[in-house]
Amino acid sequence: MEKIRIIAPYSYRDPVISALHDLGVMQIEEMREDVDRLLSPAKASEQAKTVMDYLQKFRGYENILPKRPVRTRAKFTSLADILNEASKINIDDDIRIAVNRENDIAAAMKDIDSRLSALEYMKGYDFDVSIFNGKHFESYIIPDKNVDIKAFSSLNAEIVPLKNAFIITVAEDRTQDLSRIANSIGARLIHIPDLKGKPDDVIAMLNDERAKLDQAMQEIRKHLGDLSDKYYEKIAQIREALEIEAKKIDVEDKLKGTEYTFAVEGWIPSDSFGRVSDAINRVTGNSCIISTVKTNEMPPTLLRNPRRISLFEFFIKFYSLPEGTEYDPTLIFALVFPVFFGLMVGDWGYGLAILLISLFIIHRVDHPPAKSHIPRVISRFVLMIMSPQSLKTLAKALIPSSIVAIIAGLLFNEFFGFAILPFTVFHVYAVLPKLMLIAGYIGLGMVVFGFILGFIEDLWMKDVKGAMDRLGWLFFAVGIATIGLNLIHHDLTFSVSTGISNLIAVALIVIGIPLIAIKEKSQGFIEMPSIISHILSYLRLVGILIASVVIAEIIDLVFMKSIVSHSIGLAIAGVVILIFGQMFNLILAVFEPGIQGARLIYVEFFSKFYHGNGRMFRPFRSQRKYTEDGLDFDKAR
């Protein structure tokens, strides 16, 4: 990344901003303080208010009109072109009248529905509805035949029983008391409308009125649909174009200039300088100055990884985005995490299940069904933790992880704890000491690799003390690990003939400690035990594998004993234990290796070189769905 400054005549401000937007490779920043003092804020755009007014109007159009597919992309050559097209669509009066009428009809239909809900309980009775309301009393339906009528005795109310409800009539000044008592016993009240006629006749009349209102509503919606057929595609295109223009106007606040010139600064990828320079020179007719800005500012972070690796950027961003000058560890995470995960699962049955679940999640997110058969409680809980796209990314990351688990499970001959293959390459219990040793070597390798990356990074940043500190920790870690391994394999000796590796290890420790003290001083001595713990922490790769295998085998053992017990009850219980026990262990096989695998990378590895706390590179651009880049390099906007 490098910071650039563009200085050009004020008359080219709009085409320059359009060019930068359509290129989409520059994060525009506030001007540096030393330059800012020499310049004034940029003039406000003369068209700003017009753009915002039209944008508000067209957003309203798009929200009100029925949705229609947008099959084409529009190309606008200038802001004037956009405003000209926007001025041709003036359907304010049509939409306002239609919406007001629609709201009135909806309110009337709601009122009719409310009246019908009360009258439904009176259907079939031969009395006039008007007898239940007067100047000094009101009546209500209690739609519950099991309600305790005695609770209303203090109201001196008239109560008339119906088939499935009661009618209660009270004095007008007792309606609040009625509501209070009804709330206290959990009874619902429905006010009887002030109407005349027998219930069946009134119901028929109200249904006729509702049918007429429904017909009027359909006519309004048809009218809105006709407007949508005619204008929706163009409205969506103009709305998107106006949003882009509004974004360009907003960025003008970061510009500085004089009466005749303006200046803009920002970050671009280093390999985009030529592209930006060519485009700006073209729109200004070579009447501009484009230069790089030397600065000690930390640049924003642009992550660039192959498509299949980029999905693991999710995990890096979750932890902390690397600084702009830092090494991007996404590739390392993408290679190491699946291996750690698969080794800790170590069962090809669980690996196959995780693979199928991952594929199901990806398909489900891409093709959501009209009606889900997954319990709503589970789906809500999952979506509360992660968005659908995050869930899809996690599922994609688990595909290579599950494949490694399948391979490891085939080697260990583990299928949900059963040894169903006719061969076993490595029996987990038989090779346990070797697995522990391999995990230790993996830990040493990861820690050493982390310090090497930190050493290179400090040298790149010309931090000599930091580089010496990393080198000291590297020597100390290798020295301690060498002595520890020699303790396991051989007697600890320091003779030249039999213990040369120990002498080298001690020398590395002796050299490493002063190098650590150069930067960290006494704090370094406190941190030394943590290096040993970081290396040993990788033994959890084997620990979690053994735990998973043991739990699966215990579940299988209980199941097998129940089957041979000659008891139907025990056999059924054994099947239940097998199913739910394996489901529980499968959940553990997803979460525990996932959490611990990520932790080994985040804590034990990243801490050796990674700073994080970077800021995302956010170039000045927009995602276009309905429009094309409209920049004409020969004309101003």
Swiss-Prot record:
Summarize the protein's role: Component of the A-type ATP synthase that produces ATP from ADP in the presence of a proton gradient across the membrane.
Quaternary structure and interacting proteins, as annotated: Has multiple subunits with at least A(3), B(3), C, D, E, F, H, I and proteolipid K(x).
User: A Gene Ontology MF term for this entry?
Assistant: ATPase binding
Protein topology in the membrane: Multi-pass membrane protein
This protein's major location comes to membrane
The organism's lineage is: Archaea, Methanobacteriati, Thermoplasmatota, Thermoplasmata, Thermoplasmatales
Domain of life of the organism encoding this protein: Archaea
Residue ranges annotated as transmembrane are 342-362, 403-423, 436-456, 471-491, 498-518, 541-561, 568-588
Query: Could you tell me the keywords of this UniProt record?
Result: Cell membrane, Hydrogen ion transport, Ion transport, Membrane, Transmembrane, Transmembrane helix, Transport
Q: Name one GO cellular component term.
A: proton-transporting V-type ATPase, V0 domain
Family statement drawn from the similarity comment of this UniProt entry: Belongs to the V-ATPase 116 kDa subunit family.
Subcellular compartments:
Cell membrane
- Pfam families per record: V_ATPase_I
Q: What is this protein called?
A: A-type ATP synthase subunit I
The Gene Ontology biological process terms listed for this entry are: vacuolar acidification
Q: Point out the gene that encodes the protein.
A: atpI
